[in-house]
């Protein structure tokens, strides 16, 4: 298996069916599986999941954790790459997965990456602009971030630069399984993705920003 896509869910709502349709409509040469980990939905989320060839795992709401639930979902798959999206992150391209994995495979030192987020069409103007400028900071192409001798001092001294190099988002991310099994997410209440990326950057690994693997 090339890719395991993990989606934590709880009361995902009507949009989730559209998300799964886009996930399963990917035009890709990579073999992929989709794992949903539901933590106590009381709406029709389970019924929606069962319409698709997903692997479903249900856990009590009390057992949910942003880090540990994603770790659990990843452990149930076999893909060489683990892709995390949220229940409202809809692939904005039929080449989303192909572009993401191609970019990850372009450099053997890349251990994780995140893709651009587009605003939904009905998003308010302020949020649209906020998203635009946030991701504009990462570049207009696929961009690789790494601490080197040239930027190490800047990383230590500038908070904004540290954030740039360590930013990561599980709304739309991809991690090599061999690395994730060695360095899983921390069991924390939030920011498990940012903590992980900071650790990887400071260990000397490379992080990818993919301009061509978009989700809404």
Please describe what each predicted stretch is.
Residues 21-31:
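Short, acidic, metal-binding catalytic loop of nucleotide-sugar glycosyltransferases
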Residues 38-46, 89-90:
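A conserved acidic beta->alpha catalytic loop
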Residues 60-77, 87, 95, 99:
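Glycine-rich, basic loop-to-helix element that forms the pyrophosphate-binding segment
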Residues 82:
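Short aromatic/hydrophobic "clamp" motif used to bind/position activated sugar donors
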Residues 90, 94-140:
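Conserved donor NDP-sugar-binding/catalytic core segment of glycosyltransferases
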Residues 145-175:
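A recurrent flexible, glycine/aromatic-enriched loop bordering the glycosyltransferase active site
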Residues 190-196:
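Acidic donor-binding loop at a coil-to-helix junction in glycosyltransferase catalytic cores
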Residues 208-214:
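Catalytic beta-strand/loop signature of glycosyltransferases that borders the donor
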């Amino acid at each position: 298996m090339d890719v395991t896509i993990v989606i934590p869910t709880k009361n995902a709502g009507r949009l989730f069916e559209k998300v799964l349709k886009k996930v399963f409509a990917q035009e890709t040469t990579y073999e992929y599986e989709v794992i949903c980990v539901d933590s106590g939905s009381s709406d029709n989320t389970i019924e929606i999941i069962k319409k698709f060839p997903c692997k479903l795992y249900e856990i009590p709401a009390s057992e949910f954790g942003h880090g540990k639930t994603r770790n659990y979902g990843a452990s149930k798959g076999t893909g060489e790459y683990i892709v995390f999206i949220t229940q409202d992150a809809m692939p904005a391209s039929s080449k989303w997965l192909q572009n993401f994995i191609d970019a990850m495979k372009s450099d053997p030192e890349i251990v994780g990456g995140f893709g651009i987020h587009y605003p939904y069409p009905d998003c308010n103007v302020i949020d649209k602009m906020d998203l635009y400028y946030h991701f504009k900071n990462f570049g207009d192409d696929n961009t690789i971030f790494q601490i080197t001798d040239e930027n190490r001092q800047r990383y230590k001294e500038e908070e904004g630069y540290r954030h740039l190099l360590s930013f990561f988002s599980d709304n739309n991310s991809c991690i090599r399984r061999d690395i994730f099994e060695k360095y899983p997410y921390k069991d924390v209440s939030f920011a498990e993705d940012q903590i992980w990326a900071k650790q990887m950057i400071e260990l000397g690994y490379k992080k990818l920003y993919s301009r061509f693997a978009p989700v809404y």
